[in-house]
A protein has these predicted regions:
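Extracytoplasmic/secreted proteins, especially bacterial periplasmic and envelope-associated proteins
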Residues: 33, 59, 76-79, 91
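N-terminal signal peptide c-region/cleavage motif recognized by signal peptidases
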Residues: 15-19
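Gly/Gly-Pro-rich "capping" loops immediately C-terminal to redox-active cysteine motifs
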Residues: 42-69, 78-82
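C-terminal capping alpha-helices of c-type cytochrome domains
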Residues: 82-106
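Cleavable N-terminal signal peptides
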Residues: 9-10, 20-21
């Protein structure tokens, strides 16, 4: 590879990484709190806890913002969502929405 290309690519990736850091946590990072109840990859194993995997991103984002803003009430979710920024909510919503859910026939 040409040295100029390597330098350009390095500078570009540093710029993108800095932008991502400035925007807050990634969806996967925010999700580390969620997986305790909602399961790895959003497939819940606890009774009464909804699975998040494959849910529409806009739905997940809307619900988290309602929990954060006190418009939807759940003691646990209101506390968990409170410190999240819009960018973090959008990132974690996109992260859970990306997983496909496969249902087995009985």
């Amino acid at each position: 590879m040409k040295p100029t290309f390597i330098i350009f690519a390095s500078l570009l990736s540093v710029g993108l990484a800095t932008e991502a850091i400035a925007a807050g946590k990634t969806g996967a990072e925010v999700a580390q709190t969620c997986v305790m109840c909602h399961g790895e990859n959003g497939l819940a194993t606890m009774p009464g806890t909804p699975s998040l995997a494959g849910q529409p991103e806009i739905y997940l984002s809307s619900q988290l913002k309602q929990f954060r803003d006190g418009k939807r009430h759940n003691e646990v979710m209101n506390v968990i969502a409170q410190p999240l920024s819009d960018a973090e909510i959008d990132a974690v919503s996109a992260w859970f929405a990306q997983f496909e859910v496969h249902v087995k026939k009985r």
